[in-house]
């Protein structure tokens, strides 16, 4: 039987340099950053099904990391000294984007699947949008492209964004006219590894819930803490380090059987609502109530969603 290989990738991203002049608050900046991510750090491993690593790659993107107007839009921009230390020690290499993509393409060809935790972001947004940016950057139409992006950002902050990708949930990574099957590790973990009572109890005991309190956290960090029993583990949020822990998560999932191409938009929903779980496990109800109240304390509206949360609190208080 042919040995299978898996490429596990992670990216760290900034966004377009004019985002800050268009966004009126942090949420609008976040919305632009999610819609228009520019990769500045990319790393990947190639491993077998046991998690043995065959190859590792890690690069800083010259056109984004070394351009302050771009890198300063990154959520983790304070990590610049850490990156420069890594660069000085030759622990990470800086290359132009096109050179990195040539290496990535060759490694994708040598793998049976390309994988990422939240693959929809890395393979459907971050890499494709960076491709468009770099292509425009080295063209004679860059200013026209930037003007279109500025108008698009204005639409995003005004709550309207018609940039649709009909192939967003097709488990295929398209890169320079080549196609590679995707396995979304977030969805895989939610299906095979963390949708169980032990994990949900772990989340409730430690307050590991989503911001609204309605769902259990299911990030790579939280999943790895539970699966590796490394409960104090903190995700690095640098590309190769994160790809390494995601390689271990994949190996755990492969112990439960072979994988098939898959991608998910909201895999955390696999675990169900926290309030449904605490109906059967009422000792945790106060954890959920407190989290929802904390979320509501930051809101000042009378929306349907707010009223829904208030009704959930009322329901939980009667248990």
Model features per residue range: what roles?
Residues 296-307:
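Charged, low-complexity interaction regions
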Residues 74-76, 193-205, 218-219:
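Short, surface-exposed amphipathic charged segments that create phosphate/polyanion-binding patches used
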Residues 2-7, 11-133:
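Conserved non-catalytic scaffold segment of RNase H-like nuclease domains
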Residues 77-198:
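Conserved DEDDh/DEDDy metal-dependent 3′-5′ exonuclease domain
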Residues 113-120, 124-125, 202-284, 291:
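Acidic, Mg2+-coordinating catalytic module of metal-dependent nucleases/exonucleases
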Residues 11-14, 185, 246:
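Ser/Thr-centric signal marking residues that sit
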Residues 64, 71-94, 258-284, 288:
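C-terminal or late-domain output modules
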């Amino acid at each position: 039987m042919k040995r299978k290989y898996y490429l596990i990738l992670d990216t760290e991203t900034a966004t377009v340099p004019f985002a800050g002049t268009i966004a009126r608050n942090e949420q609008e900046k976040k919305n632009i950053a999610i819609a228009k991510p520019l990769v500045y750090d990319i790393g990947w491993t190639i491993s077998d099904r046991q998690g043995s690593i065959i190859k590792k790659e890690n690069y800083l993107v010259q056109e984004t990391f070394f351009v302050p107007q771009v890198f300063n839009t990154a959520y983790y921009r304070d990590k610049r000294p850490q990156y420069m230390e890594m660069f000085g020690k030759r622990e990470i290499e800086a290359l132009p984007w096109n050179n990195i993509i040539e290496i990535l393409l060759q490694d994708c060809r040598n793998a049976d699947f390309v994988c990422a935790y939240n693959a929809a972001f890395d393979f459907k947004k971050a890499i494709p949008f960076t491709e468009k940016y770099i292509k425009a950057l080295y063209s004679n139409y860059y200013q026209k492209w930037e003007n279109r992006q500025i108008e698009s950002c204005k639409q995003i902050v005004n709550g309207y964004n018609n940039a649709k990708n009909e192939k967003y949930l097709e488990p295929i990574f398209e890169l320079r006219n080549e196609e590679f099957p995707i396995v979304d590790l977030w969805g895989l973990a939610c299906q095979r590894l963390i949708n169980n009572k032990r994990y949900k109890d772990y989340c409730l005991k430690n307050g590991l819930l989503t911001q609204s309190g309605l769902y259990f956290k299911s990030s790579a960090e939280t999943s790895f803490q539970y699966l590796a029993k490394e409960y104090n583990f903190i995700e690095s949020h640098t590309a190769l380090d994160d790809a390494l822990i995601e390689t271990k998560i994949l190996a755990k999932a492969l112990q439960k059987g072979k994988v098939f191409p898959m991608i998910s938009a909201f895999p955390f929903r696999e675990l169900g609502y926290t309030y449904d779980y605490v109906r059967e496990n009422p000792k945790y109800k106060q954890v959920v109530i407190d989290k929802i109240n904390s979320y509501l304390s930051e809101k000042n509206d009378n929306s349907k969603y707010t009223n829904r949360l208030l009704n959930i609190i009322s329901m939980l208080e009667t248990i």
